[in-house]
Regions:
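Conserved pre-motif I regulatory segment
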Residues: 1-28
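Motif I (Walker A/P-loop) of helicase-class P-loop NTPases
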Residues: 35-44, 165-170
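Conserved nucleic-acid-binding Ia/Ib motif block in the N-terminal RecA-like helicase ATPase lobe
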Residues: 51-104, 197
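Conserved C-terminal RecA-like helicase domain
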Residues: 56, 64, 71-80, 276-357, ...
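SF2 helicase catalytic motif II
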Residues: 113-133, 140-183
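Non-catalytic terminal extensions of ATP-dependent helicases
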Residues: 127, 332, 351-355, 442-725
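Conserved interdomain linker/interface between the two RecA-like ATPase lobes of SF2 helicase motors
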Residues: 174, 181-183, 188-200, 204-285, ...
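Conserved segment of the helicase C-terminal RecA-like domain
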Residues: 374-377, 381-383, 389-429
Length: 725
């Protein structure tokens, strides 16, 4: 079968046939094999039918990338973008949005709290106010946004098990009307059939699974050290077993050694390292050494300069002389903290094949399609904020899968920097990585207080209990309980023959074995009872009791004023609601309010130091906010949702400066940090803008306040914050 002049691979053809037959489909295929072509086909199929489709992505950068791709493919009038930052053509038949936006739309009704594109001096009309008031049920197919919706494409569907965001994925799949088809895409998931069985059960229609295990460009994994050079894993193992170099106190292998060993044909290369500071440091260090001179000879300096000159016309203060010298040698760096415009420049240079080495963190591998000839890992462990932990197979393959460019390379090389000193610790992990023994998707379902109040606003407790029973977490618990029940039956049958014999007929060893069997059976029965506990319902009841205790709900689950506020708050839910109730936002000017929200959305790196504010007013704000932050209600809420409340007061004056119109570089002068933090600050301003949008919904009945907040949103939506990155 051909599509767009391409002969489809068998797995693509299988998925397309299921789509044509009207099925929902889950597709698991390695990075670079063409999963997105299936999504393109579905979109085209639905457009031809006069319907609508939503494409959800886990991150805004990927949403923005898909928007650019689909406007080029289907035309600007056919494609819309809806994220927390931007709303473009929201009524288009093809809409790209983050997963959270669609979930909010289904849970809350209306636009899910997304800002309309209104002019700063435009007051909200009655229709706009009524959008906020809608109370349609999550499964109500008559929401205006989904009346003609035929399908939802969920990219990176394995995010179901993400600890911080997986609940949103589950809620979306539970609330989505069953008439709407699903296309789920994943690079790797060992139990996708289990996910399909769950969806088949709750959606009452057969959900198909399509798998592709072969890579379009096969991977070859190498180990590299000064003593061995770049060698296949098997040879590295043999050298290690032979004792070569082990424990001899040899010189450690550095990043530049690897590039010195690499032949020209192995470039371009992505170098993954899990530290922002080292991403920048290593890139600049490589440019200064002998390897930098080698790479400089390979670089197209003239073409790079053309890009740099165009960039500097628009952003004259972003690049330092050292930055430009590094980029001119075809060496780049990329992480979430760098200036958004610089990030876009680096991606532009890389796509134009003008960078031969790109140092990056794992965020570069998430969804964005930028393959390389070679992928290099600085190591196979990373710091997760608490401990140094091994990479999961899924994380490793997400990054390793960038090696090998389809249609250009016959093979993609994956090189791991590894000395003999700690190879004992790495070997078991390496075996799992090479075998691609991907971890199963495990539910991380955990309702927020925002979800709880929105559910009780429109459902009784039995309906909510039924909804919780439809979650993937409940499905997995039931499945495990069934398996355990079968084991118990087998154990009982196994014990039966021995149990029938009188004790006097048994010898000491047989008696001991019978006691062991009884204990084992009792343990299995206790485990089964534990598995059958309605944990989600118990958790829901605890949160419900919390909301009653602190007067958010009546004893009959009617919404009190705090809960009516909470229905619109999605970030730092209880903390922000309590700040509103305490009146601490009332006396703040709009610019101060924006600054205050910045303190609730970002945590600074440990080494970052922010200049103390000169204005005494901020010390009073800090004290007021801190009193709420340390209050019993906020502390107890934090325990119940098992996440830490964000409170970073030193960022507040920086946010106020942005709202006043100060330039990003001037604001950055007030922060001392070893790495570029402009990207962090821009991300902070964007999330604070989201919070202002939520406050705007809270004040739906106060036209003057809403108008003021709308103006504030337009004021902060400028320059870097408005960049479509």
């Amino acid at each position: 079968m051909d599509y767009r002049g391409l002969t489809l691979d068998p797995f693509q053809e299988e998925a397309v046939e299921y789509i044509e037959d009207g099925h929902s489909v889950l597709v698991a295929a390695p990075t670079g094999t063409g999963k997105t072509l299936i999504a393109d086909y579905l979109i085209e199929h639905i457009l031809d039918d006069g319907g609508e489709v939503i494409y959800t992505a886990p991150v805004k950068a990927l949403s923005n990338q898909k928007y650019r791709e689909y406007t080029a493919l289907f035309g600007r009038d056919k494609v819309g973008l809806v994220t927390g930052d931007l709303v473009i053509n929201r009524d288009a038949p093809v809409r790209i949005m983050t997963t959270e936006i669609l979930r909010n739309m289904l849970l809350e009704g209306g636009h899910g709290g997304v800002m309309e594109d209104v002019e700063p001096d435009e007051a909200p009309d009655e229709a706009e106010l009524s959008d906020i008031e809608q109370t349609a049920s999550p499964s109500d197919s008559h929401l205006p946004e989904i009346e003609r919706l035929q399908a939802v494409i969920i990219d990176e569907i394995h995010f179901l098990d993400d600890p911080s965001r997986g609940t949103v994925w589950e809620e979306l799949l539970i609330y989505l009307p069953t008439r709407i088809r699903i296309l789920g895409l994943s690079a790797t998931a060992s139990n996708l059939e289990e996910v399909a069985s769950w969806l088949t059960e709750i959606r009452e229609t057969d959900v198909k699974v399509v798998r592709e295990n072969e890579r379009a460009v096969p991977l070859k994994i190498y180990m590299a050290s000064l003593e061995t050079g770049i060698v296949p894993v098997k040879k590295f193992n043999n050298l290690y077993k032979g004792g070569r170099g082990r424990g001899n106190g040899g010189k450690s292998t550095r990043h530049y050694h690897l590039f010195d060993m690499m032949q020209d044909w192995r470039f371009p290369a992505l170098y993954f390292i899990f530290s922002r500071k080292l991403v920048e440091k290593l890139a600049r260090g490589l440019a200064r050494g002998d390897v930098g001179r080698k790479l400089s000879k390979m670089a197209d300096t003239q073409a790079i300069n053309e890009h740099l000159n165009a960039f500097e016309e628009e952003y004259p203060e972003v690049l330092s002389p050292r930055d430009k010298a590094t980029l001119r040698k075809g060496i780049g760096w990329h992480h979430a903290g760098i200036h958004v415009a610089l990030k876009a420049l680096v991606e532009e240079l890389y796509e134009a094949r003008l960078l031969n080495v790109l140092y990056c963190t794992s965020t570069f591998a998430l969804g964005i399609n930028m393959p390389a000839r070679t992928v290099v890992f600085d190591g196979l462990t990373k710091y997760n904020g608490v401990d140094v932990v091994p990479l999961t197979v899924r994380e490793f393959m997400q990054m390793a899968g960038r090696a090998g460019r389809r249609g250009i390379d016959e093979v993609g090389d994956v090189i791991v920097r590894q000395d003999f000193d700690d190879y004992d610790e790495v070997q078991p992990l390496l075996g799992r990585l090479i075998a691609e023994e991907s971890e199963p998707i495990e539910s991380s379902f955990n309702l927020t207080f925002h979800s709880v109040v929105n559910l009780v606003a429109r459902f009784d407790e039995e309906e909510i209990r039924s909804m919780l029973e439809r979650s993937f977490r409940a499905f997995q618990a039931r499945t495990e309980a069934e398996r355990l029940g079968e084991r118990i039956e087998d154990k009982r049958a196994e014990n039966a023959a021995v149990e029938q014999q009188p004790e006097e007929a048994l010898g000491p060893e047989a008696m001991q074995e019978r006691r062991r069997s009884r204990r084992k059976l009792a343990a299995l029965e206790r485990e089964l009872a534990e598995r059958r506990r309605p944990r989600l319902w118990e958790d829901f009841q605890r949160k419900l009791q919390f909301l009653r205790t602190y007067d958010y709900l009546t004893a009959h689950n009617e919404l009190e004023p705090p809960a009516r506020i909470l229905r619109h708050i999605k970030i730092e839910e209880i903390f922000l609601t309590e700040l509103i109730l305490a009146g601490h936002l009332e006396d703040l000017t709009p610019t101060e309010l924006f600054g205050a929200m910045c303190g609730l959305v970002v945590s600074l790196p440990r080494r970052a130091k922010v200049r103390r504010p000169d204005d005494d007013k901020w010390w009073e704000v800090f004290a007021n906010f801190e009193a709420v932050y340390e209050s019993e209600v906020v502390v107890r809420a934090e325990d119940l949702v098992d996440s830490e409340t964000v409170f970073t007061p030193e960022v507040m004056p920086l946010g106020e400066r942005w709202a006043r119109g100060d330039q990003l570089n001037d604001i950055l002068d007030d922060i001392r940090n070893p790495t570029d933090m402009s990207g962090d600050l821009v991300g902070c301003f964007r999330r604070a803008k989201d919070m202002i949008g939520q406050l705007r919904d809270v004040y739906y009945s106060d036209a003057a306040r809403r108008k003021e907040l709308t103006r504030l949103i337009h004021r902060v939506s400028r320059d870097e914050v408005e960049v479509l990155d």
